[in-house]
């Protein structure tokens, strides 16, 4: 690839060489963006969980939800796939914040359904719209019979969510900081970091702080792969 090409042209060349459908939105937080198909709608897979987390913090900021309230794993929350709550069994009780944290860091599907049930699907969508993500919708709770219709979003909306978290402007500075800390613990970050030199991310041998840290939320289903951070 020509090293004299602009970043946008280099990214476009990679995207256009791909046989499937791919779009990207990049924001350096200093006024420069790369936008290629940024307003195309895509199935969210588990990336919708980032919006659910934001909706939870918005409701908590208004006193309409409590991060410390206990919620219970009910039979209707069960769904297969990623997560740890399957090992605990129906009847397990945990704080809303703990369920939301599991929803992000290990993409726990049961925890996600618990949070959706706690907030309400319509409330979540109202919060998503209010936060300015006009092309993002949570269509259903997680159920593999409906997984292809879980939610839709755009690269622009998803990048905007993380840009606001990074700037401390999503809900509030305190809420953004808490969400950022949760996103930093996300286990499934290999898509974003795939081509990063490992020594940038892992400095355990030297004892030095990592040169790069990642706060993200990925999602995948069938032939769909999404990531953002």
Regions found by a protein language model. Give the residues of each.
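Mid-domain, small-residue-enriched loop/turn segments at the edges of structured enzyme/sensor domains
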Residues: 21, 114-170
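Active-site-proximal alpha-helical segments within enzyme catalytic domains
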Residues: 50, 149-184, 225-229
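Conserved catalytic neighborhood of penicillin-recognizing serine enzymes
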Residues: 78-113, 151
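A short glycine/serine-rich beta->alpha loop
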Residues: 36-43, 89, 100, 147-148
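Short, Gly/Ser/Thr-enriched beta-strand-loop segments that form substrate-interacting elements
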Residues: 194-229
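Short, glycine/proline-biased beta-turn/loop segments that scaffold the active-site neighborhood
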Residues: 62-88
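Beta-lactamase-like hydrolase cores
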Residues: 1-43
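Active-site SXXK
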Residues: 43-71
